[in-house]
Structures are given as structure tokens and as C-alpha cells.
Amino acid sequence: MDLLGTTGAVAISLYAALSTAYKGMQAIYALPTNTTAASTPVTGSGAPPSVDVIVPCYNEDPRALSACLASIAKQDYAGELRVYVVDDGSGNRNAIIPVHDHYACDPRFRFILMPKNVGKRKAQIVAIRESSGDLVLNVDSDTTIAPDVVTKLALKMYSPAVGAAMGQLTASNRSDTWLTRLIDMEYWLACNEERAAQARFGAVMCCCGPCAMYRRSALLLLLDKYETQLFRGRPSDFGEDRHLTILMLNAGFRTEYVPEAIAATVVPNSMGAYLRQQLRWARSTFRDTLLALRLLPGLDRYLTLDVIGQNLGPLLLALSVLTGLAQLALTATVPWSTILMIASMTMVRCGVAAFRARELRFLGFSLHTLLNVALLLPLKAYALCTLSNSDWLSRGSPAAAPNGVKDSPEPHC
């Protein structure tokens, strides 16, 4: 066997060994523990903790925003609930003002209109500083939450050791295209395998932004660091959910996952939008992995395997693919061993997912392997080479809000 063949064989063998160990342990730790969530209120008075729901909004579709706010208004939470909708300098403000007006007479709702676009993170922080609830729930403006989400997340926050908790994400537009169906399965796996396994040790590495609850006392301790995140001396304006989660863990708080708290969010329905989203996520993951490495000595050893599996695994897979392509180009021989290894591992993973979810559609997730090899691996390489780029890609250019309004107008009941 020549050098090229040897390199390919070693790379795919190491990838298979690492993936088997990582995914095997992940599958075990992701199994339900049959422990019931605590049902005692967080506050010592016996009353449920007050909850502030923050909804940052930028150029949102009025229908999506209306559905989001309607789902929040229907929460069955027994405690005090307040809602802060922050319009981050939207250019379509005239179109969404009627949505605001619909809730103008609901005393739970307050609308904050930013005079210009400042970014999701700063919009969040404005609402955090304006509000005062015991717990803070972030909900993206294109996300709808089940009626019991606030209740279930607040129960998970019973212990003062818990700094953050996230719900389970699904794709609200799952039926749109083959891509949205694939992303919906991707979300299920990310939540019910990756996050569920991490939560076994109280260390969910990213409490996803569409539906994540935080303890205010913990937030206030970390707010300055969160607001002033820098990367290579420049402000970092995306990946706020992952960075805030890492800050929580670094401060000694637990981060949890609540699969019963269901949130449905709009996912990209075109390949271009999906790849732009994945590029942002890859950059933020690489950036915050450097911070996460410092946490690993204080966490369970599984989390070390998790970080290695998520970062070294794609590198070994990319090396396997590159050597396979080189073998095909230089020797005109098909790298069957690499192809068969990747295919067999894909089918095993999809089979396990289909069994756990009790849904045969997960067998179709094998298509994601082709997408991963053809597009996502090169995209991750590009992300690694452009870590300093903080462009959101999906955002339009900052738009000034009409009339420079800073707060909501008088309600019209």
C-alpha cells in the first residue's frame, strides 16, 4: 500500500474508532433517566418565580411575529409573566406595528423600539436591563412555543445551581422542502442526542437561542462579559447563545435540557440560507471551543470526549475524503474501503435514531452525509480560515427606524 492509501486507511480507521466511541457513549447518556423535574418554586416564599420573556425582532415577517407573540400570550404559567418585544431598528416597522397594537392593551406586554439596528445581543441586553423578573426566557421572533414551555423550563430552574435551560427545537416549516425535513431531523438529533447526553452532567454546551431560559442573578454577574465579547480584538456579534452558555459554565452554573419544552422555529428552506446559517454557527463554535477547553478539567470526562468528537471527528472525515479523492484522481481506483466505512456508519446512526424516535423517516437522514461531505466540510474549513469575520450574512444592512422612536407609543385600545 502506498503513502496515499496508508494515509486514507489510517484516517478512516481513526474516524471510525472515534465516532464509535463518541456516538456510543452519547447514545447511552442520552437515554432518559426517568427522573421527574422538581416542582417546588424557585423563590423561598412559595410563589412561582416571575419570568420575563424577551423577543428580539429584526425585519421579521409580521405573520411569524404574530404567531410568536400569540404562543407566548397563551402560556399556562401560574406565576407573573412579562413580555418585552425589542424591535431592533427594523426597516419594515410599519408592517409590524399592527402586530404590536394587537397586544397594546395586554398589561404583560411592553414594546421597545430601537432607533437603529444594534444587533440581537445588544437588543437582548436592553430588555434584560429594563426588566426585573427572577428568570429570563429568550424566544426568537420566528419561534412559537408550546403553552407549557415557561412552566417546564421554570421547574428545571428550581435549583439555584442551574443557570440556564433550553427546550427542544423543531422546525415549524418542516413540510416546506426536502431540506427543511432534513433540518428538522438534524434538530431532533442535536437536541435528543447531543444536548441530552451533555445534560446528564449538567453541562449543555449551547443553550440554543430560540428557546432558552436564564437565571437573572447569574445573568447580571455575566452581563458585562457577554456584552463586550471580543475575538482577536474585534467585537463578536453572533453566536450569543453559545457564548452565554460557556460563560454560565465558566461561572460554575449548571446548564440543562428540557425535552418536554417544545419550541418550533422557522428553518432555512433554501440551500443558500442554510449554508449561511451553518457558516455563522461554525465560526461561533470554533471561537467558543477555545473557551470551552478551559472548562473541561472541571467537567465529566464525557464532555472532553464530546469536544474531541465534534472537532477532531470532522477533521479526520475530511482527511479521509481528500485522500479518497486523491486516490481516485491519481490512480483511477475507487476508495471502496472509505466509502463502505462511511456508508455503514451512516446507516447505523440513522437506524439508531429511527429506533429511538420511533420514526422511519430518520432513515432518510443518510442524505445528510452526502450534504456534509460535499458542502459542510468545505464550509467548516472556510469558517476556520475566516474566524475574524463577524458578518451575520443573513442580516440586511443596518436600517434606521422611522422617526427615531425609542419606546412604544401610547396604547390604542
From Swiss-Prot:
Keywords of the record, alphabetical order, are: Cell membrane, Glycosyltransferase, Membrane, Nodulation, Plasmid, Transferase
Which topology term describes how it sits in the membrane?
Peripheral membrane protein
**Subcellular compartments:** Cell membrane
Per the record, the major location class is: membrane
What's one GO-annotated cellular component? plasma membrane
Which Gene3D superfamilies has this protein been placed in?
Spore Coat Polysaccharide Biosynthesis Protein SpsA, Chain A
Lyase: is it a keyword of this entry? no
Source organism, top-level taxon: Bacteria
GO MF assignments: hyaluronan synthase activity
A biological process (GO) of this protein is: extracellular matrix assembly
User: Which EC numbers characterise this protein's activity in its record?
Assistant: 2.4.1.-
Q: Which CDD domains match?
A: CESA_like
Question: InterPro entries, per this entry?
Answer: Chitooligosach_Synthase_NodC (IPR026463), Glyco_trans_2-like (IPR001173), Nucleotide-diphossugar_trans (IPR029044)
Q: Could you tell me which cysteines form disulfide bridges?
A: none
Q: What class of enzyme is it?
A: transferase
Chain's role: Involved in the synthesis of Nod factor, a sulfated N-acyl-beta-1,4-tetrasaccharide of N-acetylglucosamine which initiates a series of events in the host plant species leading eventually to nodulation.
Family statement drawn from the similarity comment of this UniProt entry: Belongs to the NodC/HAS family.
* Protein name from the UniProt record: N-acetylglucosaminyltransferase
